[in-house]
C-alpha cells in the first residue's frame, strides 16, 4: 500500500512558475523552506517544478497539469485561473496582495553598446534588430510593452503636464517594426540574445544581471522611466489534497519571510517586504522615474486598454 503523506516518502509540492523564477527557487527558496519544515515537523519536503512563459504556465494548469502552486508574471493570469475555478482562494488577501517579488524592465545590448542605445526610443533606430518575447505566451512581453508605452507617457507628462498618447503609440509602433524574433518566454529570449542574435533585448533586469554574473559580454541600459513587474503567487485550490494543504499554505507564507526575500534579492529580484534588503544588491540600476501597474489603473485596465486596443489592434496588426 502507498505510504500516507508525511511518512518515509515525505511530501511533494508541485510548483509551476514563469521562466525567470528558476534560479532563486531552486538554489535558495526550496532548500530554505525544506530545512525549516524538517526542523519544525520532521518531514521531508520535495519540490517538482516546471518553468515557461506565464501565459503558457497558466494554459498548462487550465489543461490539467497537477500544479499545487503557481508563481506568475502577471496578475491577469491568476485571474484567468480563478475565472475557470482552479483558484478559489483570494490571493489578494495574502501579504502584499499576493506579490512575492518585483524587478524593473531594462534594455540589454552587446558589450560596448555598439548601437548607442540609451533609452527606449533608441530601439526605433532604422535597421536595429530587436529581440522581444511573444506577448501571446509571455507575461514578461506584456510588461515590456507597458514599460515602453508607459515610459513615453510619463516622460511627456513630466515635460508638458499631459501624457502624450500619440507619441507613446508612435514610439511603440516604431520599436515593434524592429522586432525580428519573438521567443515564447523571457528566458528563451535571453538565450536567443546570448547566442549572438540581434542588437538588443527588452527584458527583466534580473536576466541581464544573471548574464553579467556568468561572464557574458552584455551591458544593461536602464531607461529613464520604466515599469517594475510584480509577480503573484496563487494556490491551485482544485489540485491541493487535504493532506498537503498545510505544507502548501506554509510554503506560500514562507515566500514573505526575511530568509526568502533576501534570497530573492541575492538572485536579483527586489524584495517587496523590506526595501533595506535591496541595498544588499549593489548591481541594481538607478531608475529615475519608476512605474507600477497602478499607473495604468491595474491589470483590469492595462490589459484591454494597452495590450489589446493599442498593441494588438494598432501596433502588431500594422507592423
Segments and roles (model prediction):
Residues 18-20, 54, 64-66, 74-77, ...:
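Solvent-exposed coil/turn segments that connect beta secondary-structure elements
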Residues 106-108, 219, 232-234:
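Residues embedded in well-ordered beta-strands
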Residues 82-155:
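A conserved helix-loop-strand patch within extracytoplasmic ligand-binding domains
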Residues 1-84, 93-94:
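Early extracytoplasmic/lumenal segment of secretory-pathway proteins
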Residues 6, 238-319:
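Extracellular/periplasmic juxtamembrane helices and adjacent flexible linkers that interface
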